[in-house]
Amino acid sequence: MADVRKLKNYIDGEWVESKTDKYEDVINPATGEVLCQVPISTRAELDQAAVIAEQAFEKWSQVAVPRRARVLFSFQQLLIQHKEELARLITLENGKNLSEARGEVQRGIENVEFAAGAPTLMMGDSLASIATDVEAANYRYPVGVVGGIAPFNFPMMVPCWMFPMAIALGNSFILKPSERTPLLMEKLVELFSEAGLPKGVFNVVYGAHDVVNGILENEIIKAVSFVGSKPVGEYVYKTGSANLKRVQALTGAKNHTIVLNDADLEDTVTNVISAAFGSAGERCMACAVVTVEEDIADEFLEALRTAAKNVKIGNGLDDGVFLGPVIREENQKRTIAYIEKGVEEGAKLTVDGRETGLSEGHFVGPTILEDVTTDMTIWKDEIFAPVLSVIRVKNLQEAVRVANLSEFANGACIFTNNAKAIRYFREKIDAGMLGVNLGVPAPMAFFPFSGWKSSFYGTLHANGKDSVDFYTHKKVVTARYSLKGYEE
C-alpha cells in the first residue's frame, strides 16, 4: 500500500495533509482496484476549516454580485472543457456507465449555470408607498458559512446543487464529500480555483462521523445541506436544528411507477428498465415499485422480464455496458439479503440478479420480484440497488392508494395517454416530483428537488428559488422620506 496516493483536505486554498492516522481505501467497484486512500479527518480539521471560511466570508460577501457571477461563469466554462475527464472519474470511482456519468456532468454544469444568474437571483423587492411618505424594500444577504454533506451516488451533480449557488450568493462553503467517491471533488476544486475563486471561500474536508458532527455543531456554520439516507438525514436535521442552524436534508425514497392499460408498451418498458436499473438503482429517483393494471400486466411483465435479462452488465468504462456495479461489497451482500428476504416473505423472483457471472467487482444484475404486497420488507425499505418490485392492481385508484402507503414521497411516475387519469394522478399522489410518460422525473436546476414525507426534512428544498431562499437572509427596510419643502 506504500505506493497508494493519500488524498489531502483542501483548506484556505491549499491541499493540506490530514492529521489523522485513519485512512480508507477508495475502490473501483467494477474491479476491486484501490484507487487511492481518503483521510477520515478529525474534528479539529473541520473546526480549522470553519475559521478559515468565516474569514473568507467577510471579504467574499462584499464582492459585487456581478463579479461573483463572473467567477461562476468561468467555472462553468472550465467544466465544459473537462467534461470527458470528469465523466471518466465518476465512472472510475462510482461505477455507473460512461453515458450516465456524462449526463451527471451535464446536470452539474447546468446547476453552475443557474448559480451564475446570481445578480438576478439576489434581487429583492420594494414598494414605493406603504403609507404617506413611507416606502419599504426587501434586501437579500448571504447567511455566512455553509456546510454540505454529499453522497456517493452523484459525486458531481449533488455537490453542484450546493456549493455553486451558496458561493454565488456570497457565502463561503465547507463540503464533506462521500469518502467513497472523493476523486471527482479533487478535480472540481482545481477547476474552481482556476476560475478565480479566492482562497478560503470553498473548503473540502474528507471524513466520517467527526466531520459530520463538526458541521452540525460548530457555531460558525450557519446552514447545512445534506443528501443521503433517511437515518442519517434524520440525525442531521435534528442535530443541526438543535444547534440553531438552517437545515435541508434530502433523504430516502421508494418511488412508484403506475402503468395503465393504454400505456405505450414498448416505450414504457424502455423507461422502466432505465429508471429501475440505471446507475445500479443507486439513486433517490430510481423506480423501485411498478404497479400495473391487471389487463395489461401479463403482456407488460413478459416484455419487462425479457428486457431485464438482456441488460449488459460490466465495467462502466466498457462499450455497451448499461449496468455497472453497486458501490461496495457490503452493498452487494445487503442487496442479496433483501432479495432473499422478499422470496422468504412470498414474492416471486422472476428475474434473479444475484449471480452475474463476473469474477471481480461488486455486481448485482437486474432483479424483478412479482406478487409483492405492501407488508413485505422489500416494498417498505429503500434497497438502493437494481431491484424492482411489481404489484398488480385493478385500477388507477388502487395504484395511487398503494403508492401513498409508503413513508417516502420523493417521486412517482405514470404511463398513460388519458388526460383525466394524469390529472387524477397529479392531484392524488403523495410525492414531490412527478413524471408523465417518463421514468425519472428529476427536475432541472431552476425547479426545486421537492421530496415529501420521510424523503425530506426541512422547509426549503434544494435547487430553484428554494435554494436562493435557503442560502440568503432577508432584511426589510422601512423608511420615511418627507417631501416637505418640495411641494409645488
Swiss-Prot record:
Q: How does it assemble?
A: Homotetramer.
One BP term from GO: inositol catabolic process
Name the protein family. Belongs to the aldehyde dehydrogenase family. IolA subfamily.
Catalytically driven reaction(s):
3-oxopropanoate + NAD(+) + CoA + H2O = hydrogencarbonate + acetyl-CoA + NADH + H(+); 2-methyl-3-oxopropanoate + NAD(+) + CoA + H2O = propanoyl-CoA + hydrogencarbonate + NADH + H(+)
Query: Keyword set for this entry?
Result: NAD, Oxidoreductase
Task: Name the enzyme's class.
Answer: oxidoreductase
Any idea which residues are catalytic in this one? 284
Q: Does the keyword Iron apply?
A: no
Give residues annotated as binding NAD(+): 150, 152, 176, 179-180, 229, 251, 382
Q: Which SUPFAM superfamilies match?
A: ALDH-like
**What species is given as this protein's source?**
Listeria monocytogenes serotype 4a (strain HCC23)
UniProt EC number: 1.2.1.27
Pathway assigned in UniProt? Polyol metabolism; myo-inositol degradation into acetyl-CoA; acetyl-CoA from myo-inositol: step 7/7
- Has keyword Methyltransferase? no
GO terms (molecular function) for this protein are: malonate-semialdehyde dehydrogenase (acetylating) activity; methylmalonate-semialdehyde dehydrogenase (acylating, NAD) activity
Query: What is the official name of this protein in its record?
Result: Malonate-semialdehyde dehydrogenase
Q: What does this protein do?
A: Catalyzes the oxidation of malonate semialdehyde (MSA) and methylmalonate semialdehyde (MMSA) into acetyl-CoA and propanoyl-CoA, respectively. Is involved in a myo-inositol catabolic pathway. Bicarbonate, and not CO2, is the end-product of the enzymatic reaction.
